[in-house]
């Protein structure tokens, strides 16, 4: 009796699944799709049997899939002598990598130091300092531009004063020359 109810529950679940997949109309044409796929496969087989090149390609596809398999190299048996030659050829590289690995292992305790663990705190402080530095750079640029403007004004003023003093000097020289000429005439 329990087996019958299990079968009925399974049947109900399958019907619900079919409604989800195929919609409320039921399994419309599920056999037609399968039949269509079989027909396509038979048609491809007939076409392939008529053409020699296609037959050869179908045979080569299997080989290609086999060669593209990443485990294919693992299946090929490499003699121990060849493996030894590979290892001996890379001996210096392996030794240098071992030395580097030993250095890394020696430096591992440094990674557990309080300085490294405090990096997040320092990063936040560094970010704030970087922002302050950028603001100060902007202020420095503004001050530099203002200083340049003031120096240009100073240079213009100095140049005008210099020209004015030269003109006054020339005028004074002319007046002194005219004054010296008058007493000589009397």
Swiss-Prot record:
Entry keyword set: Acetylation, Cell cycle, Cell division, Centromere, Chromosome, Coiled coil, Cytoplasm, Cytoskeleton, Kinetochore, Mitosis
Top-level lineage group: Eukaryota
GO biological process: cytoskeleton-dependent cytokinesis
Family: Belongs to the dynactin subunit 3 family.
Function: Part of the dynactin complex that activates the molecular motor dynein for ultra-processive transport along microtubules. Together with dynein is involved in spindle assembly and cytokinesis.
Modified residues (N-acetylalanine): 2
Subunit structure: Subunit of dynactin, a multiprotein complex part of a tripartite complex with dynein and a adapter, such as BICDL1, BICD2 or HOOK3. The dynactin complex is built around ACTR1A/ACTB filament and consists of an actin-related filament composed of a shoulder domain, a pointed end and a barbed end. Its length is defined by its flexible shoulder domain. The soulder is composed of 2 DCTN1 subunits, 4 DCTN2 and 2 DCTN3. The 4 DCNT2 (via N-terminus) bind the ACTR1A filament and act as molecular rulers to determine the length. The pointed end is important for binding dynein-dynactin cargo adapters.
Gene for this chain: DCTN3
Pfam families assigned: Dynactin_p22
Name listed for the protein in its UniProt record: Dynactin subunit 3
Keyword Cytoplasm: yes
Cellular compartments annotated: Cytoplasm; Cytoplasm, Cytoskeleton, Microtubule organizing center, Centrosome; Chromosome, Centromere, Kinetochore; Cytoplasm, Cytoskeleton, Spindle
Cellular component, GO annotation: centrosome; cleavage furrow; cytoplasm; dynactin complex; kinetochore; midbody; spindle
């Amino acid at each position: 009796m329990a087996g019958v109810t299990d079968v009925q529950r399974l049947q109900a679940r399958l019907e619900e699944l079919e409604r989800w997949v195929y919609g409320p109309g039921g399994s419309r044409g599920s056999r037609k799709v399968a039949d269509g796929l079989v027909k396509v496969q038979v048609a491809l087989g007939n076409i392939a049997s008529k053409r020699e090149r296609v037959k050869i390609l179908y045979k080569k596809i299997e080989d290609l899939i086999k060669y593209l398999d990443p485990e294919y190299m693992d299946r090929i048996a490499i003699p121990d002598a060849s493996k030894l030659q590979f290892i001996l050829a890379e001996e210096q590289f392996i030794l240098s990598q071992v030395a580097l690995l030993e250095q890394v292992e020696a430096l591992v305790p440094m990674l557990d130091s309080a300085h490294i663990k405090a990096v997040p705190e320092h990063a936040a402080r560094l970010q704030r300092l970087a922002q302050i530095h950028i603001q100060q750079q902007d202020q420095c640029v503004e001050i530099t531009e203002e200083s340049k403007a003031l120096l240009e004004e100073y240079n213009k003023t100095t140049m005008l004063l210099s020209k004015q003093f030269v003109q006054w000097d020339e005028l004074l020289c002319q007046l002194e020359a005219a004054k010296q000429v008058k007493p000589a005439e009397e």
